[in-house]
Amino acid sequence: MKRKVNFSVCITLSLFLLFLPVYGQQSGDQPCFKQRPALVFPGALRATMLGAAQAGQRIVAVGDHGVVLLSDDQGKTFRQAKAVPTRVTLNAVSFANDKEGWAVGHLGVVLHTVDGGETWGMQRDDLSSDRPLFTVWFRGNALGFAGGLWGLLLKTTNGGTSWEEVKLPVTQGRKKAEKNLFALFSNQKGDLFIAAERGTVFKSADGGQTWKEIATGIPATLWTGVALKSGTLIVAGLRGRIMRSEDGGEHWIEVNSGTKSSITGITELADGRILAVGLDGVSLQSSDDGRNFSVSSRPDRMALTAVVSSAQRDIPVIFSENGPVAVK
């Protein structure tokens, strides 16, 4: 039986994953979905945005229905990309420079742009299985990784022309790697990290050739992570849990976030402040390398889904279930 479903890995993820619709089919069915270009429509500015990145001076955000939004004035105004070859939800975006970038989403979609996000081409999709990609990271315009459902990690060494699956370590007592991968990021040394399910961080110190699994010490799923200029690592996620590491991810301590609302995005601003956003309209800010956070909430409790620092100002650009949040 063919059906359209809301993606839900487990009950603890249901709140956040309300924003991640996916088309699926039962095992054994033939693919029932054909790619169609994203519509260009006025309501795109109110679409749920799930990922954002800097592309030089431009900010590019991706989200529901294949919507890609662009801002050339540091988040004051946005417009829709001219051509996107899919209507599936896009979850994350990464740019190697001001022109070349990649976006990933449901149905294993990988999109590629060479004009700063104005137009996109399809590099990969997988209509035969229901394994969405949640995160993407590139170093330069050749080496890249994309991570997603049930431990799916893809690697490219040619800018996404071809992808191969990478085998992650298997958790003791498990038969295969199956933890969902939510956020790829790197530090200034070049180490790679993946914030993942059940309080897990994966680390590679050799450019992604080998990986090790590190338990942060909490059971909560980690949805986002950042490497600060100081070298400190911060990961965060379900029910407001925040973990911090000062030794390259080998050991972690928990930071009191002051909230039970799940954290969906985190970034470091140019002035060194750290800003995290989350469900229920929550924002958290730290000025001491992530040791302490102050918390505030929007009166309307609108879910905040992504945050990126602007290239020229110490003002974050925030996205939500209703599109970009006005910059003050």
Model-derived features: positions:
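Bacterial N-terminal signal peptides that target proteins for export
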Residues: 2-11
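Residue-level hotspots at or immediately adjacent to binding/recognition sites across diverse folds
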Residues: 23-328
